[in-house]
Amino acid sequence: MTPAQSYPHLDVLFITPEIHPLNKTGGLGEVSAALPTALSELGMDVRILIPGYPQILNGLKNKQKIAEFAAQSSFPAATLLSARLPFGASGNVPLFIIDCPELYRRDGGPYTDPQGHNWPDNAIRFGLLSKIGAILASDASPLDWHPDVVHCNDWQSGLVPAYLHFHKGTKAASLMVIHNLAFQGVFSPETVSQLGLPQTSFHTEGVEYYGGMSFLKAGLYYCDHIVTVSPTYAREIQVAPLGFGMEGLLSLRHEHITGIVNGISDEWNPVNDPHLEQNYSMDDLSGKVINKAALQQQLGLTVDPDVPLFGAVSRLTYQKGYDLLLRIITQLIDIPGQLVILGSGETMLEQELMRMARNHPGKMAVRIGFDEKLAHLIEAGADCFLMPSRFEPCGLNQMYSQCYGTPPLVHGTGGLLDTVVDCTAESLADGTATGFVFHELTPEAFLGALERAVAAYRDKPVWDRLMRNGMVQDFSWRASATDYRKIYLSLLNQKR
């Protein structure tokens, strides 16, 4: 028996502007709750640094003051509090909260005012997050705890690697994680001096970005390593258009970029999902048929166990490929097939999808908005899940679908290509096939994949294999955390 591998102890400072469920606005909030917990369960000492918004301060008990920071540059004085997340396994992960009422105690969201406009002092608000993160990751820290790695997320903590670069003492290795490259934290050139950065940093080989200064570019330029949320997306962002203007820098740093697919929450599990009509597992798939009938009945479709039912839960946008879907709906219905869609987005696409549904009663249903229970029922009740996205950094629904025995049909981009194995004779034979992938972004290619899916659906042994192959995939956060640990250890070895 091989002894379990032992790893060096790792201290990690995880910096984020949001965390589920206290102040989540998007996917980063989910990651910030789940990944530190998974890292902690691998034996790392992880501490989360976050601004002290009202939702954070009001949602946490037993807060203790552990440090104070004097005013400097344009930053007001701030107090550092410690607490622990009050829910689930995440309660094992300590939180450091920056209490600075002048910057953070406001109505509205983390980034915008109650009217949805960006706070005008966001550069200072997130500059302070970065500055304190850098202090805690350096030998200037007032704490006894010193991280080996500082894990930065998106532009809001992008200045941490820059501050560390210009600090001459001992400091942690820095990791910059891109969740959304489109948001770049761009501000006026004057911001450089306001944030206490040297004027020499305002350069193409520094924080300068098309005449302004960019927090994200600062992070990407000065960090020790870059991670994004899938291997394919890591390659795609090195060229236009998916580089969003950063492709030159990213291609120069290609040897320092890694793609790690996000994990998914344990709540997406057909064995114990409370939203389903009937729970089921890989050992007993009979509940899937019951959920299909419940979905058909609830949405006014003809209840038929044999017709292939395609499902989608998404923002209804051009980026998500819904203009392509519109062009093949008639052929899908004529197969014959059924289609259910849940989501909201661009008005034109919403209206056209609703019109198509009215034209195909009993065969197509569209629900505008979001409904958690229905989203889970679609994953369980559909036979095949559609994701024709033009680009998709990671994607989650294609992973949910596989857990529910619902083979996904996807466009081969980003995380979709990394998490779905196209059904071919070879992939069926070696047991890796989990869905259907089309590569050309055309209605014809999409329809071709759809026809392949229908042919496989009608071959019950093949479809059964596809379902089961998907259900055994490991999309856990533990798998993602294990990949992050490899990066951390590599950075530590480079620092020595």
From Swiss-Prot:
Keyword flag Transferase: yes
UniProt keyword annotations, A-Z: Glycogen biosynthesis, Glycosyltransferase, Transferase
E.C. numbers: 2.4.1.21
InterPro entries the UniProt entry points to: Glyco_trans_1, GS/SS, Starch_synth_cat_dom
Signal recorded as keyword: no
Coiled coil: none
Signal peptide range in chain numbering: none
Annotated protein name in UniProt: Glycogen synthase
Molecular function GO terms recorded: alpha-1,4-glucan glucosyltransferase (ADP-glucose donor) activity; alpha-1,4-glucan glucosyltransferase (UDP-glucose donor) activity
